Design a protein with these regions (language model features):
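Glycine-rich FAD pyrophosphate-binding loop
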Residues: 120-146, 152
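N-terminal Rossmann-like FAD-binding beta1-loop-alpha1 element of flavoenzymes
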Residues: 101-128
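Extreme N-terminal leader/targeting segments of oxidoreductases
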Residues: 1-103
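Glycine-rich active-site loop/strand segments that organize a redox cofactor
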Residues: 148-179
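Residue-level detector of alpha-helix initiation sites
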Residues: 109-111, 133, 224, 291, ...
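An anion/pyrophosphate-binding glycine-rich loop and adjacent beta-alpha core
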Residues: 2-19, 320-444
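Conserved redox-cofactor binding core of oxidoreductases
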Residues: 53-74, 78-79, 191-275, 280, ...
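Glycine-rich loop(s) and the adjacent beta-strand/alpha-helix scaffold that form part
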Residues: 283-340, 344
Length: 455
């Protein structure tokens, strides 16, 4: 008798998904997917169903350089919150600080660790201060892959166009240009450091096509890409202890200005000893990550517990303007069951390998690889307006992501090998994702925008 990790209340819907699977797999093998939407349809769907396009859940900023701008309520609350300490009380301690260094890096994820390595290679003494442990960051939770246009039939030009299109032509084109030109160099640098990307039998990179892309350019390490990258970066940073000092459990609570008005360091708070520390630095780099744990609009999130928008607050209190924070990125497939995993990322790689979003009646309702904002809006529409979602025992709603299609398309064992992390995570709850689909709903994923920079 077949066992299932899903409760009895979901079995009828599961049976409908199973009964329609063979036909859907045949269509997928012939590349016959649910039709893709046009750009005009994108805008219509987003305006109706995407959380960022709804007027509720926003307030106007009352202070600072962005005064009058409407932003998410949760973000407004931390930007306008009362400071924990008065920096003026600590300014004199810059003359006799607890620590002094060339470069202070606030944040210990992938960006902070990379900045520390680059600074140390340029003869700088570095202090890396992190809120939790070194490596406790969103980087370590990234799964599906990292993009770079490095195949013969691809180019940074196409990567640029895909990125601009995915951003609905509102991107900062200079930053996008930097991203797409640097990406192949960064992939090579990571590989040289020791990151083990998935490879083809001939030794070339195994690259997949993600949502909104016209070419295959997603480099992965099974479905644990961020974990693999962070493993190598963390190891490399810790092997340079002569130049990089790590202060764990020491979040920054304020930045400090020196007598010239330039940033001269920061106030840290040691969570273990409950004391404030002053770090004097010739340069300060903010690498604090996003704001997912603010749970904008009440959504679950893929983000780690330290992702509370600290860098935005630190910079805004010094008068640095905010840019492009109007929209957040929601990942279309966050776990909606079991309850212990709510919001957990279900990597895009699942859909890249062939799994399709399916409603409660076992029907396709959208192309599996639309841009993330569009895919999220389509899933919300299916659940909220069309009432075609699956209701969990706790009252949550979601759609099926039919992962068993992957083994039927690519051969038995593909799910367990290519999605090793997800396979084990769901196995703990009695769900074999090679045989049963996952229940998903959009989850807060990336912070778009941030503090304004000079270039």
């Amino acid at each position: 008798m077949k066992t299932s990790g899903y409760p009895e209340s979901l079995q009828e819907s599961l049976a409908k998904v199973e009964s329609s699977r063979a036909k859907r797999v045949e269509l997928a093998k012939k590349q016959k997917y649910f039709h893709k939407l046009s750009p005009n349809e994108y805008e219509e769907i987003l305006k109706k169903y995407h959380p960022d396009y709804k007027p509720e859940g926003r307030k106007r900023l009352k202070v600072g350089p962005n005064k009058g701008e409407k932003l998410q309520t949760e973000l407004i609350e931390i930007l306008q919150g009362q400071p924990w300490v008065d920096p003026i009380d600590f300014k004199k301690r810059l003359k006799s600080p607890d620590f002094s260094t060339d470069v202070l890096i606030i944040g210990g994820g992938g960006a902070g660790s990379t900045a520390a390595l680059m600074a140390s290679e340029n003869d700088c003494q570095v202090i890396l201060a992190t809120k939790l442990r070194h490596g406790d960051a969103n980087t370590i939770m990234a799964e599906g892959g990292i993009q770079a246009a490095d195949l013969p039939y691809d180019s940074p030009y196409y990567h640029f166009l895909d990125t601009i299109g995915g951003g609905h032509f509102t991107n900062d084109k200079r930053l996008v240009r930097t991203l797409v030109l640097d990406a192949p160099i960064v992939i090579k640098w990571l590989e040289d450091l020791g990151v083990m990307f998935d490879k083809e039998p001939d030794g070339t990179m195994k690259e997949l096509k993600g949502g909104g892309l016209c070419r295959r350019r997603m480099h992965s390490s099974k479905d644990m890409t961020g974990l693999e990258i962070m493993r190598v970066l963390r190891d490399e940073v810790r092997n340079r202890a002569d130049r990089i000092e790590i202060l764990e459990f020491c979040p920054a609570v304020e930045l400090l200005l020196d007598e010239t008005g330039a940033i001269g360091g920061a106030i840290l708070y040691n969570l273990e000893t409950e004391e404030f520390l002053v770090v004097k630095a010739k340069a300060v780099i903010l690498a604090t990550g996003g704001y997912g744990r603010l749970h904008l609009y009440g959504f679950a999130t893929t983000n780690h517990y330290g992702a509370t928008g600290d860098g935005l607050v630190l910079g805004y209190r010094l008068g640095i303007p905010l840019r492009n924070l109007k929209y957040a990125q929601f990942h279309p497939t966050g776990a909606a069951f079991p309850e212990q995993c709510i919001g957990m990322l279900i990597t895009e790689k699942v859909r890249t390998l062939g799994a399709e979003p399916i409603n409660c009646d076992g029907e396709r309702f959208c192309h599996p690889l639309e841009p993330r904002d569009v895919e999220s809006a389509l899933i919300i529409r299916e659940c909220v307006e069309r009432n075609k979602g699956v209701i969990t025992p706790t009252g949550r709603v979601g759609v099926w992501l039919d992962s068993p299609m992957i083994d039927m398309i690519w051969g038995e064992g593909t799910v367990e090998k290519a999605l090793a992390s997800k396979y084990l995570q769901f196995k703990r709850y009695g769900i074999d994702i090679a045989k049963e689909p996952m229940l998903v709903f959009p989850t807060l994923h990336y912070q778009n925008g941030g503090l304004a920079i000079n270039e």
